[in-house]
A protein has these predicted regions:
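Short, well-ordered alpha-helical microsegments
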Residues: 132, 157-160, 248-252, 306, ...
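Metal-cofactor-binding active-site regions of metalloenzymes
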Residues: 62-156, 289
Length: 347
């Protein structure tokens, strides 16, 4: 809303065949490590949370929102100039079809997505449930396809701990924290009980890292330094650096090299731009065969980029990465992370 010449170690997952006999690369299965699965009520809560805590996002990403929701950009911009809620109404007008889980899964299958980590939220829906509760109930029968990573707000440390415990008991498989929406520093010792509980429960934490547009909060919230502090203090905690800490990708990658529980996930950024000089992603590609090989996850953020997930995966394929790296980044590392977390939960 981020020494590479040595042999890479195996991540413990089977490597799919990604080069056909004719020399054409065949895309392996995709795991979307940063997905948003909401009905319209959930999307309204999501957009309102952005508007209340980081209204810049409704402006900066206006074209992306309109493209995703099929809304008129002109009508949206006109509404946003008057009242934020009117702009949300343009995106989510009455009469939109209800969320259809079967249709969602069918689309995921068409895009080659075999699993997704769906990010939740502790915000309340009109019916009184949290978004986390709705999501956990909605995907209860398809947890092999959709794993819920429950959203937490660190504004209330005790409340965050209670939400973690409730969500874990209901089947959550990870957690999601967005510091710039809370205005909190995750590395503050006040939150240590939350991270200790996450580690003990085998719940990886997706943490928004790197650049953000919320002018009311400092840019350092969720930096590589945050991840370094958390990983050093909570050695058993599994951390996913959402957006890979961009533009400080090299520092985040070096942090991951120091801490075996840290992973980088590059949602919101298009793979096709990564090789361009000045993109900030050069370190990831330079170290792809070494320290980055088993630490990078593919993600989308769902609404940010144009086009379907399969197209983004194809952009990754076009980078001409070694077959084993391409497979690891697209799904192998995410599957290995999920298996590692499951092993902790199993005791």
């Amino acid at each position: 809303m981020n020494p590479s010449s040595g042999p890479a170690t195996s991540n413990g997952t089977a490597t799919a065949t990604v080069v056909a006999d004719a020399g054409v690369r065949v895309r392996p299965p995709v795991v979307d490590a940063c997905s948003l699965v909401y009905d319209d009520a959930g999307w309204r809560v999501y957009l309102n949370r952005l508007g209340e805590n980081a209204p810049e996002y409704l402006d900066v990403f206006s074209a992306s929102f309109c493209r995703y929701f099929g809304a008129s950009h002109t009508a949206y911009r006109d509404a946003l100039a008057l009242r934020r809620q009117d702009a949300v109404d343009v995106l989510l007008p009455p009469g939109r079809p209800p969320f259809d889980l079967a249709a969602h899964l069918a689309d995921r299958e068409r895009q080659g997505v075999t699993r997704e980590f769906a990010m939740g939220s502790p915000e309340r829906l009109p019916d009184g449930r949290t978004v986390n509760e709705w999501l956990l109930e909605t995907v209860r029968g398809v947890t092999d396809r959709v794993q819920v990573w429950a959203g937490l707000s660190l504004r209330d440390p005790a409340g965050a701990l209670r939400e973690l415990e409730r969500s874990a008991a209901a089947g959550a498989r990870g957690l999601c924290v967005i510091p710039f929406l809370d205005g909190t520093d995750p590395a503050d010792p006040r939150f240590s009980p939350v991270w200790d509980a996450a580690a003990a429960a085998g719940l990886p934490v997706w943490l928004h890292t790197g650049h953000h547009f919320a002018r009311s909060h400092p840019s350092g919230l969720g930096s590589w330094r945050t991840v370094e502090a958390l990983a050093g203090r909570h050695r058993e905690l599994l951390l996913v650096a959402g957006h890979a800490g961009w533009p400080d990708v090299q520092e985040m990658l070096l942090t991951a090299a120091r801490h075996p529980g840290v992973f980088l996930e590059f949602s919101s950024h298009r793979p096709r731009h990564m090789p361009k000089p000045g993109s900030g992603w050069e370190p990831l590609l330079h170290h792809a065969r070494g320290m980055a090989r088993d630490r990078v996850l593919f993600g989308t953020s769902t609404w940010v980029n144009p086009g379907p997930t399969g197209s983004l995966a194809d952009e990754l394929a076009a980078l001409a990465l070694p077959a084993e790296v391409f497979t690891a980044w697209l799904s192998g590392n995410a599957e290995a992370l999920a298996a590692r977390a499951a092993g902790t939960r199993a005791g």
